[in-house]
Design a protein with these regions (language model features):
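N-terminal accessory segments that position/regulate proteins before the catalytic core
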Residues: 1-174
Length: 174
């Protein structure tokens, strides 16, 4: 798991996740009848857990195995999730990294421009590249597709109306 070398402000996320009554098949088919809602801290916690979190652990005499919500080619887990938080949501405004092991947000940057929260999925190619060489980039993209589909389904099932942006606005961020 990724770790930041310095102590940064951390916000533990709620572990009591809100439930949904939407059938999974209806959510995936786009036919679920779910009342629209706004993103709040419990829903954000649910989205992060169901898309990038540790959902189960197994203890062995030689190691502890962590099972993540989204599968990963070869178990390399090259993706990181960041949450851009303007004022609100019960969190300090800023850019936060999701720590899946502790189910917490770590503030790594200042308050973003804009008025809506955003989840940003980034890839760390060397995590797959050292094993899969030139095919490593493909595995990052496959993993991103898996995680994003779970994230969108979890958001849809909660009535959050997510939007996926696949073109990063480099000029706006620079």
């Amino acid at each position: 798991f990724k770790r930041y070398a310095v102590e940064l402000p951390r916000v533990p996320l709620p572990r009591d996740l809100p439930a949904t009554t939407a059938p999974a098949v209806a959510v995936l088919a786009g036919t679920a009848d779910v009342s629209p809602t706004e993103l709040d801290l419990p829903q954000l916690s649910r989205l992060l857990h169901l898309s990038a979190g540790v959902v189960r652990t197994t203890e062995r005499p030689y190691a502890t195995w962590f099972f993540r919500a989204a599968g990963s080619a070869g178990g390399r887990f090259p993706l990181e999730v960041y949450v851009a938080v303007p004022d609100g949501l019960g969190l300090p405004a800023g850019l936060h990294w999701y720590d899946p092991l502790d189910h917490a947000l770590v503030q790594v940057g200042p308050q973003p421009r804009g008025h809506a929260p955003a989840l940003v999925v980034t890839g760390v190619p060397w995590r797959t590249g050292w094993r899969y060489r030139e095919r490593g980039y493909r595995h990052v993209y496959w993993d991103a597709g898996t995680m994003l589909s779970q994230l969108l389904a979890a958001a849809d099932s909660a009535g959050l109306a997510p939007r996926l942006h696949t073109r990063f606005p480099d000029a706006a961020v620079a």
